[in-house]
From Swiss-Prot:
Gene: GLYR1
Cross-link Glycyl lysine isopeptide (Lys-Gly) (interchain with G-Cter in SUMO2) residue location(s): K135, K176, K179, K201, K211, K227, K237, K240, K269, K302
Species of origin: Pongo abelii
Database matches in Pfam families: NAD_binding_11 (PF14833), NAD_binding_2 (PF03446), PWWP (PF00855)
Protein name: Cytokine-like nuclear factor N-PAC
Keyword Ribonucleoprotein: no
Amino acid sequence: MAAVSLRLGDLVWGKLGRYPPWPGKIVNPPKDLKKPRGKKCFFVKFFGTEDHAWIKVEQLKPYHAHKEEMIKINKGKRFQQAVDAVEEFLRRAKGKDQTSSHNSSDDKNRRNSSEERSRPNSGDEKRKLSLSEGKVKKNMGEGKKRVSSGSSERGSKSPLKRAQEQSPRKRGRPPKDEKDLTIPESSTVKGMMAGPMAAFKWQPTATEPVKDADPHFHHFLLSQTEKPAVCYQAITKKLKICEEETGSTSIQAADSTAVNGSITPTDKKIGFLGLGLMGSGIVSNLLKMGHTVTVWDRTAEKCDLFIQEGARLGRTPAEVVSTCDITFACVSDPKAAKDLVLGPSGVLQGIRPRKCYVDMSTVDADTVTELAQVIVSRGGRFLEAPVSGNQQLSNDGMLVILAAGDRGLYEDCSSCFQAMGKTSFFLGEVGNAAKMMLIVNMVQGSFMATIAEGLTLAQVTGQSQQTLLDILNQGQLASIFLDQKCQNILQGNFKPDFYLKYIQKDLRLAIALGDAVNHPTPMAAAANEVYKRAKALDQSDNDMSAVYRAYIH
């Protein structure tokens, strides 16, 4: 491939991972965004989307030279919107160049004409002229600072240069220095991603105006929302150390992730064990975001789809761990988690010093503590990271990740957690995440049983179940979970999104957790009995909402 000469401001076609080439513009990255090591790359903002990324130079092509070629191979609606945004940007930039020189000439003529008409002939006229000149100077100073964000006539020139070439605008305070006129281009993009690639998330700030919005993004956002552009403020991720009332210290972090955006994947080799409802979605998102992944499952056929998508196949858990830097596992219960680590050709046989193991299974604190001890005893690093969510959230990369254990490993998993989830929390020492996950699922399982109980009570008392749902959706209990589960029940759709047998398992473990500290859990205990009845009715492999059937049989 012949070397391509590219520079700042060039329009390009950029290819990111498995996504098709997309039109973008080479721009300066934000100051706090480090350039990835390795091959030469440019920071590109993509037209028609809210994404930006570091793109390797070999994945970039000049826009105009390859325009026809790219349009032929991509016919999608969003792609066409992106191309339209490029053309609009070019049209506006061209119009700006033409009007800029015309305006400069008109300004000069107006100034000359004004001088001829304003020659002073008396003392009063001299005083008027003096006042007028003072106002003109003040306004000219303000014109350099005031660059309107709502203007549709923007080009590629800097704010300072545009202000010098255009006539003075509205009155205001003069600039203190030229630094006020230098606005990072990155402040114009809405909803940007967080993490190693983007390192921050853009959010609107109502108190500040947009100082200099990039025209093509301004055009796209207006065309989609029909609202004026607003300013976006960089918010860096923070780890917050919270001192609890008990005196113990827990480290918590809420890290926003790159939902539907671009992520710079870690250069570490990733392994993944367990391709069930949750694991399948997680692996799919890891691959989409460019991670190198080796997979294994007890059912070998489950690996085939991911091999086609670019994953590598591991023959045993031990082989996966020995060939990868960080290995994740997501299995059904404590017994499966132990067998995976301690069984024949298990994880423990592949552990070497500095090898990393992340258990994403929902298990009890004793189990995860035991696994951590045997991994660390071999020189490995351990992190527990159970996930809150369901199959759909897993597929969408919108899980909530609860992590505890090796803090450094948690940070090393950053790009992986961003690919698979919307938020991650670091909860301190091993066992904390397991306890928190069981409590979360205890609340969810109990709520689901209450929903089913309410729907059946409405039915037997002659009330409309749909009307009950409508009322609940208009009140304080309204949620996606409530609406989806009720709709599925009313439609008789119990396709598993979260297996009933697993929520019952989590209720059982949560009750045991309460017993261990002499804390009563009567609501969870009652819900657990209803789920046990549903299991007796052969509902184990249906969705948790099938607990409804325990009330009607």
